[in-house]
């Protein structure tokens, strides 16, 4: 399989061959390709867990990572300030099955699909954000363009959004609603 970087992911590791444990691009050392939102999934359904970045200040200051994560940020002792020991790098977050998603008001159809995936498969914490009150999902560049209409001009770094494909403000509100419903699924310490 070829790519613009010769099949190499973060840190120059080959992400297409091997045991699937190399090619990480996250502080958690989880595989870079795992959990990405892929082209067509917002229309056809998401059938796997998603990767999510959480605010560093929310992650546990007591326990920095749990399996399947193999590490945490090098600055975790300073930047992880959360009091919930269940919220660490590698934590699986999910919406409880008792929550009726059909009874909620979704601002975008994409938000509802993301909520269904969060309830059925969960979201794994794979990295951190500096923004204190947001979460960020991993998304394939092609999916960002085709499914959401998001694009970045490589020359200028400017972002553009095709609002005929998605209401970006509505999607942000939907993701914030999903984040408010998520609960940590207990896991063994790494």
Q: For each predicted feature, which ranges?
A:
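A surface/extracellular/periplasmic glyco- and lipid-processing/surface-interacting theme
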Residues: 1-114, 119, 123-129, 142
């Amino acid at each position: 399989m070829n790519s613009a970087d010769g099949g190499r992911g973060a840190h120059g590791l080959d992400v297409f061959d091997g045991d699937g444990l190399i090619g990480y691009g996250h502080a958690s050392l989880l595989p870079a390709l795992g959990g990405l939102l892929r082209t067509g999934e917002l229309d056809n359904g998401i059938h796997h867990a998603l990767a999510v970045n959480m605010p560093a200040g929310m992650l546990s200051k007591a326990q920095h990572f749990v399996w399947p994560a193999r590490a945490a940020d090098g600055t975790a002792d300073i930047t992880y300030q959360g009091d919930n020991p269940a919220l660490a790098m590698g934590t699986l977050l999910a919406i409880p099955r008792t929550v009726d998603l059909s009874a909620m008001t979704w601002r975008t159809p994409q938000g509802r699909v993301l909520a269904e995936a969060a309830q059925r498969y969960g979201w794994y914490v794979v990295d951190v954000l500096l923004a204190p009150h947001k979460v960020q999902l991993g998304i394939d560049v092609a999916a960002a363009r085709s499914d959401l209409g998001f694009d970045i001009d490589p020359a200028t770094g400017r972002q553009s959004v095709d609002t005929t494909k998605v209401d970006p403000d509505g999607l942000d509100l939907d993701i914030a609603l999903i984040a408010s419903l998520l609960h940590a699924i207990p896991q063994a310490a790494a």
